[in-house]
Amino acid sequence: MNDLCNRYGSCVLKPLGRKDRIIAFPWGNEDTETLIEIFDQYNVKVTFFVVGEWVDKYPESVKALHDAGHEVMGHSNDHAHFNSLSADQIIADITACNEKIKAVTGVSPTLVRPPYGEYDDHVVSTVRGMGLEIIQWDVETLATGAMPWGARV
């Protein structure tokens, strides 16, 4: 990860000396209220990266996350591989997702987490040209095994 950050001059990695956590995972909305309750119980605020299609399906969950004080940021509109898209396609994809998030929360996202963690010079320059920053994970949750998420929270 640090090699990628060095290559692109900057990279946002959380936590930034604080106890911030960023969560991005595919899920329905059946556990949204449970997640909010657990995070509230521990006084934890989270940045959720959501796909625009998820916002379409579950706007009430996006609003609930936002209303509970969590950040909602973009993770693309339809989980496309940004590395294989033109600049115009990337811009259209991110814009569509961000407009959906803003319509529900009233807040324009400032961060983008590229699908599959894929990005290159082309993607970085396109995203930064939109006035946004790319954020990346530093823990791969698939490596944690089959432990239920509630046991890890």
List the predicted regions and their residue ranges:
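Active-site beta->alpha N-cap acidic-glycine motif
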Residues: 1-81, 85, 89-109, 142
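Hydrophobic alpha-helical membrane-insertion segments
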Residues: 33, 84, 122-124, 147
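Alpha-helix boundary/capping detector
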Residues: 65, 91-92, 116, 127, ...
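Short, flexible active-site-adjacent loop segments at beta-strand->alpha-helix junctions, enriched
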Residues: 76-78, 116-118, 138
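Basic- and aromatic-lined ligand-binding clefts that recognize polyanionic substrates
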Residues: 103-130
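His/Asp/Glu-enriched short active-site or ligand-binding loop at hydrolase and phosphoryl-transfer sites
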Residues: 124-153
